[in-house]
Amino acid sequence: MQYRTFGKLDFRPSALGFGAMRLPVLVGPDGKPDFKQIDYPQATAMLRGAIDRGVNYVDTAYMYHEETCEAWVAEALKDGYRERVKVADKMPVWKVEKPGDFDRLLATQLERLQTDCIEFYLLHSLDAAHWKCVVEHGQLAAAEKALADGRIAHLGFSFHGTYDLFEEILAATDLWEFCQIQLNYMDEDYSAGRRGLELAAGKELGVIVMEPIRGGMLARNLPPQVEAVWAEAPVSRTPAEWALQWVWNIPEVSFLLSGMSTMQHVEEDLEYAARSRPGLLVDDELALVARVRDLYRELSPIPCTACRYCMPCPQGVAIPDILALYNDAHMFGDVSRQRFFYTWLDEAERADQCTACGECEDKCPQGIAVSGWMEKAQAFLAG
């Protein structure tokens, strides 16, 4: 296993962190996967196998597997494994609605994890709405109290908003010691992106990368054009490894999280991590990745560059997010996943709120007929 630096902290994390969001589950009475029923034997074997091979960071959250993941982590880390890793957990900031909620939720997490202290604690999934919850309900003050009395050791946040919001959150407090952002070779300019990574690293925060394979989309159902480019590579790598090595190649990345769901995934990711290092990919290989990125973008039906000139929408429609979901569904052929993400948008932000006022179309540098695409996106994504 390779180990890397983590901001200013005296902790060297494994290049690969164990993300516990996509664990193997049992089948319910209806014959469908029951995401609340983690397959304890298989999932535990996966985690312990990863730790035996050097993984030393385990990431969970209050909401994962319908609030059953934290309890599984506690059980899986028995028999001496707890002492060999750091555990990260996350505050569901949207559930904090009144004084005392933060402490109550944290107490529940400590109980589920069977611990007195969570080493790495994140405010979960910060975007504009969730950051508003943090500010309005004094969650930073509550977190500072938890740091002071030892219920948590280090504070960070995971992020799903715009770059400007990322800047604002970083500047809001000196309590941050690390953050978690989405980054992969398709998303250099999305959300916090590469700029956010460099900004946070410049402030000596540890930076964890999530979604390095875009939820698996960069590793499966590859278009023939993409397969042909990978076949040209002088070094043979799977599409998943290309995606992971692209992230590990960046010196500012502390480590990445992989949401592994089978023992095969664990074995493969451990193998990839063992040969990872910053600067591993040479210029010709990075150019190959760029060609793949360009091919995927050519497959997207809407020429949106996520410049966000269309925002804010007078009706509150999340225009760039909706266009991205529509494009992703067509680029990667994973329609059900994008429809699921569409449900995460507030109803007031969805495409059916568009009134075709045309204000966004006047601002769009690409000349996109946004109102027409909103109608198509609503019909397609609302399913």
Which sequence ranges carry the predicted segments?
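Structured C-terminal cap/extension of enzyme domains
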Residues: 56, 195-383
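Short catalytic-loop micro-motif centered on adjacent basic/acidic residues
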Residues: 57-63, 153-157, 180-181, 255-257
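Conserved, mostly hydrophobic/aromatic
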Residues: 6, 18, 50, 58, ...
